[in-house]
Amino acid sequence: KQKAPVVRLVDRLGYDPQSGCYLFGKIAYDQKGQRIAANDKGFFLGLGLRCSSSELIEYNLDNPDSIDLKSIIQLLRKIYGNRAVFAMSYFIATLLKQEFVKKHSAFPFLSMAGPKGSGKTTLVDFLNNVFFQLWQGIAAKDASTDKAVGRRFYHRHSLVIPFNEANGSLPKNLPENALLDAFHGGSLYDRAAKSQDAEVIGLPFDAGMAFVQNLEPFTMPAVKERVVTLRFLNAEEGGVTDETRTAMRELEGLATSTRATIGHKLMEMLSALKRDIFAEMSGLQDDLREHGVLSPRVAYTHSVIAGKLGWMGCPIRRCPITLATGLNG
């Protein structure tokens, strides 16, 4: 009698260390960027696993040849300037979080701050859709328990979790000093184990986090060094013009299948992106120090998201310097 195959159940989206693949419900990508489809029952027989997730995923793709990545980047820059380039770069770098933590024992947070009407949410929704996810992230609210919020963070590995509307202060279930440990790949939340000894259990924080808010909530200098901040402008501040409105309508008109196709092409490029990102980081940190960035941690955090900007039409040496000195144009 033939034995039934042993299938492992994975309850997280994103990177799966055991298989080395990225899982998005009923699709997966291997290290070479090859797309793998589950069978009609959701099993990846070649990988010996099943990805169990209640999250909504965009599975349909347009013709990949119909997507010109550079044109998409130009559209984003027309709306947001270099902010869009840095934001997309952070989402790409987060796919490699496990590599950053292994090599450097640290991975930064992203902050997207600016007044209502500056387009932050539109950009975040677009980037979530690029990586196949039909969600907007987690809302900052005190009503959620620590355990519930911790579990929501746990269910994504090497994907960005938008943390929305922490305007001026973080909720009680996400204390600011918890970010210090999470920066180094630790847990955001710990609890006592149900045992007689001193054992503590903590859900690992393997995702990236983008804080999306009107006012930044950070007060601790040590936390601020671990956050890359992008400042967005609304119409009153000159950030929204007739030209950007036209481009925004074009962006909003892109179907989720089109956005997912952009992600598909990026996943196909991931091995090359990985090689270039890590090859360029050291030189970028040297450039930042030469331009007055004295903190090694600040130089590192900014080099993470600036390691693959050339193909996005962003001068690779100028952009991180502009960002780290506070000019987000």
Q: Whereabouts are the PLM-identified features?
A:
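Generic alpha-helical secondary structure signal
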Residues: I67-Q74, N82, N173-N177, D242, ...
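Short glycine/serine- and small hydrophobic-enriched flexible loop segments
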Residues: A93-Q98, G307-W311
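Glycine- and acidic
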Residues: S54-E58, S66-N82, K103-A113, F163-E165, ...
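Conserved active-site and cofactor/substrate-binding residues in soluble primary-metabolism enzymes
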Residues: I67, F86-A87, Y300
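Conserved NTP-binding/hydrolysis core of motor NTPases
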Residues: V85, T94-S271
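N-terminal pre-P-loop "Q-motif" helix
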Residues: G81-F91
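Extended alpha-helical interface modules used as scaffolds for assembling large macromolecular complexes
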Residues: K1-L9, L13-G20, A28-I36, F153, ...
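Extended, charged/polar low-complexity intrinsically disordered regions
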Residues: K1-R77
